[in-house]
Amino acid sequence: MECPIIALSVGFSNNSQPYVEAIIKAGGCPIVIYPGLQRNSIPPNIDGIILAGGESVHPNRYGEDFDPNAPKSVDVIRDSTEWGMIDFALKKKIPILGICRGCQVLNVYFGGSLYQNVSSCGFRDIHRPSKPRHYLAHKVMAKPGKLKNILGSNVIDVNSIHDQGIKTLGMGLQSTVISDDGLCEGIESKDGLIIGVQWHPEAIIDKQPHSLKLFQYFINRSKWHMKQSNIFSNVPHESSFYRNSIISIPIAP
């Protein structure tokens, strides 16, 4: 059986292995893409895009200067790469899953803004606890929408590893998951092609059933894109080339 090809965008400092394992477990074939990939070099046959966690989105992307109270860990090359990947996905109607930073990237891409340091903006300091990545830091509440259907519950426990957070919502996006202190923790487009979560499901995929459900939903949407591409192109899909191997595209900055 052919599996959909998933472009996984990470930073050079990321540990991509948990994401790769989650994609494979859900039935996808991952391609790991690093910052610096040019728009005209995006693999043309990808069926889905995952924007992983990592450095903060540069505040100039949403019209702000650096907050002196916020960590200044940014990657402008990765920002540019992922903007190009989102452009590509929207043009091709490819599903996108944003995780932590990836969720924030999606929000800013569509014109939203971010809190640069949620712990200094009136939110309880539970969003970056000094705990292992799999530590369940707090609960989130799902409102009616695609994410609630995927997660299968109104309230779930999640981990939390972030400084930034969604402030104003991007155009065309809905905030359908919130933390118990009121911070947006999940976004989605009306058609379900764009999903973003603030937590790290790849780190708790063996601990919380809703994590695997999220990846399975995304892979199933990607499979649908793969099938549609095959129908309209009349060309066999190339995922057999990637099966049983993980392809990395390391582009130097």
Swiss-Prot record:
Answer whether the UniProt record assigns the keyword 4Fe-4S to this protein: no
Pfam families annotated for this entry?
Answer: Peptidase_C26 (PF07722)
- Got a GO cellular component term for this one? cytosol
Gene Ontology MF: a single term: ligase activity
**CDD domains this protein is in?**
GATase1_2
Q: Where is the active site?
A: 100, 200, 202
Q: Which UniProt keywords are present, listed alphabetically?
A: Cytoplasm, Glutamine amidotransferase, Ligase, Nucleus
Residue ranges of domain Glutamine amidotransferase type-1 in the record: 5-228
Q: Which PANTHER family match?
A: GLUTAMINE AMIDOTRANSFERASE PB2B2.05-RELATED
Q: What is this protein called?
A: Putative glutamine amidotransferase PB2B2.05
Source species, please?
Answer: Schizosaccharomyces pombe (strain 972 / ATCC 24843)
